[in-house]
């Protein structure tokens, strides 16, 4: 059985992780590739009241069920299909709906804390950090949350200043040191993305 290549992509909210992920997937034609988003693995909060769930800090590592993510990745590397959880943002807890996820040649683990957990890092063949200026990240987050999630500009800015930025500085930015590849300017850095995808193509072909 062909070995599974696991690629980790981390970076702050709005850094361009999705763009980088899409470029990798586009450049790995001929291989089966799938995204395993860390956002799928927010912890189940059904034991909490709705008001208690509203207090959840989604920008803290504790919000994620890394044990389940690691277990799922181990099974996938061993050729076993898994049921991946999904999250219901309206009720602020895990959904009853799961995704049937089959083993692939390449699995991309993408999320703000993709490089924060050592056990998870050690499972990765390539670790990438998408590094983007803070001003650009907040502008992207403003656009996304106001247009796609119906939030007011004030609420997004307040959350950024009180939670997102402090959590980024404390937990996300320090994980940059674990990256094999750092992509400055995020998804707009075509030269870095081309070099990175060429390296990944070579690695996957050898597996």
Swiss-Prot record:
The keyword NAD does not apply. SUPFAM superfamilies: P-loop containing nucleoside triphosphate hydrolases. Pathway: Pyrimidine metabolism; CTP biosynthesis via salvage pathway; CTP from cytidine: step 1/3; Pyrimidine metabolism; UMP biosynthesis via salvage pathway; UMP from uridine: step 1/1. Its EC number is 2.7.1.48. It holds the Pfam family PRK. Gene3D superfamilies: P-loop containing nucleotide triphosphate hydrolases. ATP binds at residues 11-18. GO terms for biological process: CTP salvage; UMP salvage. Its main location: cytoplasm. It is found in: Cytoplasm. Belongs to the uridine kinase family. This is Uridine kinase. It comes from Staphylococcus aureus (strain NCTC 8325 / PS 47). The gene is udk.
């Amino acid at each position: 059985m062909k070995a599974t290549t696991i690629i980790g992509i981390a970076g702050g909210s709005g850094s361009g992780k999705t763009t980088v992920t899409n470029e990798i997937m586009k450049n790995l034609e001929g291989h089966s590739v799938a995204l395993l988003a860390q956002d799928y693995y927010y912890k189940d909060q059904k034991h909490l009241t709705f008001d208690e769930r509203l207090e959840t800090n989604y920008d803290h590592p504790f919000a994620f069920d890394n044990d389940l993510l690691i277990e799922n990745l181990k099974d996938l590397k061993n050729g076993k299909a898994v049921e991946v959880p999904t999250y219901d943002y309206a009720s602020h807890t895990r959904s009853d709906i799961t995704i049937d996820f089959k083993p692939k040649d390449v699995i991309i683990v993408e999320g703000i804390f993709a490089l924060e957990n050592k056990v998870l890092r050690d499972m990765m063949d390539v670790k990438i950090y998408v590094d983007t200026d803070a001003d650009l990240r907040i502008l992207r987050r403003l656009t996304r949350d106001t247009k796609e999630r119906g939030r007011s500009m004030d609420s997004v800015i307040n959350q950024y200043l009180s939670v997102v930025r402090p959590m980024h500085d404390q937990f996300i930015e320090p994980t940059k040191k674990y990256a094999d590849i750092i992509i400055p300017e995020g998804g707009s850095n075509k030269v870095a993305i081309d070099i990175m995808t060429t390296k990944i193509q070579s690695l996957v072909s050898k597996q």
